[in-house]
């Protein structure tokens, strides 16, 4: 039956929600600026449409638990340590709540809404899994996860979390009241989801799927109980298979829990335990209001006790909530989720055995259980594409649970004016739009800055800061633009504004230190970097590098050497050479070499020749090119890393001339170009044989890198040195230079 006129706004809201569910995974999993802005904007507008008053609608009355949660969230937001991320987190949280409420209301008031939303979810999962498998067959363009199913998420555990929910949505569709075509598609969705879960190689998601299926089976036990011996054997085999998959990881935890000769612990498990310990320390220090919504990554730098062990979240949703919103909020969410699962299972059991809704409700209860378990061991919630599906499934499952989201007419609750809620949603939509435009202005400003258009860059960045006064990126790039415009004092003032907004963010202090260091304000640089090191001594080696370089200018040799010893005791040579450091901070070995050269000069100045030689040897060793891949071992000799590609280019030039060296450039950059002409002119004065002698700096990741290094050669009795800067890109065939190297006379300057 066609919907009546009063239902049309709600129908439109359901269609918008369904479209967002399909589109969000392709917007960088919902993490990109356009993905987050689109999510909040569309869901907020859909929620406003769904709230349009109809004469038969009862007043909106929220139950006590939801009201208490709102109070705790508000208090946490007031006392946040990082306002910008808090605003974004609150916008996303509001979008999830609205999606959940829309799904629940639509499932009750529109006969086809539940069916349409579940079909949308499993169809989206089928499309994502199909394309992901195609990429997997092709090797995912190489990289660390070349042999795992990652899809558009770029991370196998996230892909697993997405397929987990899509698979249960397909299972909920396998009921007798669905048409054959729909059932066939859902059956294919179940099969593809199971295969995809296996191909992610994620043991945690397989465990979550098994527990979710167990809940589904227990709710539907009347169907298999008569044949319980057969099903019991199948369940036992499944349990044994699960233990075999998970056993080696559990055994890897033993050396962490009971130190001894138990072997080397699993790196991933070790990382998670460290993060959880530091997160619990954060909860103990901020038990009432937490550190603020979305502020966990900034707060973690204060508690980090080992380098290269950090992250955006602790891979445990409940600990993250307790850390960000306070312990009471963590307990409230955990308790409410347990209460919901119990009520959902009981509601399904009360339905008649032949009712298709019973099987559907059982599958939805299994989906929520699986998501709840996987959220305790991974980061599903941090991917908006997954969180939105979870919120939608939660809403559909709660539609048959009266009083859960809306208070009963005679129950305890508070009546909310629809006009007020619509106004809140419209404000959220406007905020999402302005924040996205502010992010776009930052991107345009960076482009103008790179092109040398300083007035244009300044205008864009100023506008961005006006639209989002709390944003760090706009102030960061505006400070550098102001510095390049010849106003070091103005640049320092811009950077110090970020400290006033978020004084506990060490990156704000480090930005002021960088600007002051380049601008020659050594005392300001020393103070700023010292504050960054005090706040987050384990977060980044470059905090220590800045402090050492500033102290070398204004402090005594003893102060500088003391700062160096502190840095090298934390970021030891062994640690910066570790594969984990190579993946997370590939340039740290060269930063340590840089400050070791400074320390060697200071040791020479105080007459300690033995220590000078030791430190200089350390610097030489660390500054040698690293031929290992970044985050992965590539099978392309001579192009396994950015440094290897650069060495191959110069070696080919020395041995066989420039035409042979061109094969280490990106194919589209080979041949006569402006870069080729510039390089040909600069290399005429160079000896034929030049070698890479010293790596000064490397910045980038496993796909893109910028390398600053020195090449040297001999011309008669003269030693020729050139400072070179090169951008290198990763392709399936290995690393390639983006363009011909840019040469400067003499040694590189820091």
Predicted regions and their residues:
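C-terminal luminal/periplasmic domains and tails of membrane-associated envelope-modifying transferases
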Residues: 442-639, 649, 657-664, 745-750
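Internal/C-terminal transmembrane anchor helices
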Residues: 230-246, 410-437
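Flexible juxtamembrane loops connecting transmembrane helices in multi-pass membrane enzymes
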Residues: 148-152, 209-213, 243-278, 284, ...
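Transmembrane signal-anchor/signal-peptide helices with a preference for the extracytoplasmic
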Residues: 103, 373, 427-446
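Short solvent-exposed beta->alpha transition segments
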Residues: 634-638, 643-644, 648-704
């Amino acid at each position: 039956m066609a919907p009546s006129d009063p239902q049309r706004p709600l129908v439109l809201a359901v269609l918008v929600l369904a479209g967002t569910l399909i589109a969000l995974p392709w917007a960088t999993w919902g993490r990109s600026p356009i993905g987050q802005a689109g999510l909040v904007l569309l869901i907020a507008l859909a929620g406003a449409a769904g709230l349009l008053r109809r004469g038969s609608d009862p007043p909106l009355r929220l139950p006590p638990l939801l009201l208490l949660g709102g109070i705790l969230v508000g208090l946490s937001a007031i006392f946040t340590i990082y306002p910008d991320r808090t605003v974004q987190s609150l916008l996303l949280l509001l979008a999830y709540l609205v999606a959940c409420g829309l799904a629940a209301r639509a499932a009750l008031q529109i006969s086809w809404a539940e069916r349409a939303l579940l079909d949308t979810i499993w169809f989206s999962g089928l499309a994502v899994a199909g394309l992901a498998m195609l990429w997997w067959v092709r090797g995912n363009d190489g990289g660390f996860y070349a042999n795992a199913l990652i899809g558009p998420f770029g991370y196998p555990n996230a892909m697993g979390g997405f397929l987990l929910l899509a698979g249960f949505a397909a299972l909920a569709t396998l009921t007798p009241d669905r048409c054959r075509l729909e059932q066939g598609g859902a059956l294919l969705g179940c099969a593809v989801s199971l295969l995809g879960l296996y191909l992610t190689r994620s043991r945690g998601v397989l465990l979550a799927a098994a527990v979710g299926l167990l809940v589904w089976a227990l709710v539907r036990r009347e169907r298999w109980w008569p044949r319980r011996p057969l099903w019991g054997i199948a369940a036992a085999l499944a349990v044994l298979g699960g233990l075999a998959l998970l056993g080696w990881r559990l055994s890897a935890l033993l050396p962490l829990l009971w130190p001894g000769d138990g072997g080397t612990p699993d790196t991933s498990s070790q990382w998670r335990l460290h993060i959880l310990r530091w997160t619990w320390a954060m909860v103990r220090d901020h038990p009432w209001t937490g550190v603020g919504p979305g502020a966990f990554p900034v707060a973690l730098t204060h508690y980090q006790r080992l380098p290269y062990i950090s992250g955006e979240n602790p891979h445990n949703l409940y600990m993250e909530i307790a850390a960000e919103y306070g312990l009471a909020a963590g307990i409230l969410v955990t308790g409410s989720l347990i209460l919901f699962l119990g009520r959902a299972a009981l509601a399904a059991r009360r339905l008649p055995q032949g009712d298709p809704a019973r099987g559907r409700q059982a599958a939805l209860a299994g989906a929520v259980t699986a998501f709840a378990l996987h959220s305790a061991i991974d980061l599903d919630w941090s991917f908006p594409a997954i969180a939105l599906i979870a919120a939608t499934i939660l809403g559909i499952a709660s539609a048959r649970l009266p009083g859960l989201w809306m208070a009963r007419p005679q129950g305890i609750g508070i009546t909310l004016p629809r006009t007020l809620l619509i106004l809140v949603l419209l404000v959220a939509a406007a905020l999402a739009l302005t924040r996205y435009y502010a992010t776009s202005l930052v991107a345009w400003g960076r482009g103008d800055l790179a092109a040398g258009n300083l007035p244009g860059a300044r205008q864009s960045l100023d506008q961005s800061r006006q639209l989002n006064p709390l944003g760090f990126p706009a102030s960061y790039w505006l400070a550098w633009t102001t510095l390049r415009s010849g106003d070091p004092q103005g640049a320092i003032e811009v950077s110090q504004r970020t400290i006033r907004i978020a004084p506990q963010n060490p990156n704000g202090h480090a930005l002021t230190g960088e600007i002051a260091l380049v601008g020659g304000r050594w005392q300001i640089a020393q103070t700023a970097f010292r504050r960054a090191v005090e706040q987050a001594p384990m977060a980044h080696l470059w905090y220590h590098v800045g402090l050492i370089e500033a102290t070398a200018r204004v402090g005594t040799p003893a102060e500088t050497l003391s700062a160096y010893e502190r840095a090298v005791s934390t970021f030891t040579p062994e640690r910066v050479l570790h594969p984990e450091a190579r993946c997370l901070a590939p340039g740290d070995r060269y930063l340590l070499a840089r400050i070791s050269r400074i320390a060697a000069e200071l040791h020479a100045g105080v007459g300690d020749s033995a220590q000078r030689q030791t430190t200089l040897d350390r610097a030489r060793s660390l500054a040698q090119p690293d031929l290992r891949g970044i985050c992965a071992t590539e099978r392309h000799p001579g192009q396994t890393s950015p440094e290897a590609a650069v060495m191959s280019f110069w070696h080919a030039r020395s041995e066989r001339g420039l035409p042979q060296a061109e094969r280490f450039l990106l194919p589209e950059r080979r041949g006569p170009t402006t870069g080729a002409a510039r390089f040909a002119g600069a290399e005429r004065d160079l000896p034929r044989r030049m070698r890479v002698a010293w790596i000064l700096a490397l910045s980038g990741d496993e796909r893109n890198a910028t390398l600053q290094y020195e090449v040297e050669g001999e011309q008669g009795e003269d030693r020729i040195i050139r400072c070179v800067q090169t951008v290198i890109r990763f392709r399936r065939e290995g690393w390639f230079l983006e363009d011909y190297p840019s040469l400067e006379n003499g040694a590189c300057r820091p």
